[in-house]
Amino acid sequence: MAKLSCSYLLVFMLVFSAILMVEKVEGEECRLTIDKATPCHLSDCRLSCYTGYNGVGECFDDPNVPGPDNCGCRYNC
């Protein structure tokens, strides 16, 4: 019976520590429009976002910036 209780305690501790680690990893996500002067090329956008902000670059239409597509960067703040 003591072995069973110890096993339950160990499993509970592992699950609890995993939950705590997941909460730390989840952060606030920021979004920034980069390179507003030129049209978006996906490969260049992803490269500049990754090197500058360690994020994911994507092309989207920003209504505040003139032009068809702009490069946006999503990254952890």
Curated annotation (Swiss-Prot):
The keyword Transmembrane does not apply. It comes from the Eukaryota. The keyword Cell division does not apply. Coiled coil: none annotated. GO terms for biological process: defense response to fungus; killing of cells of another organism. Its main location: secreted. It is found in: Secreted. InterPro entries: DEFL (IPR010851). Disulfide bonds join 30-77, 40-59, 45-71, 49-73. Keywords: Antimicrobial, Disulfide bond, Fungicide, Plant defense, Secreted, Signal. GO terms for cellular component: extracellular region. Residues 1-27 form the signal peptide. Belongs to the DEFL family. This is Defensin-like protein 161. The gene is LCR27.
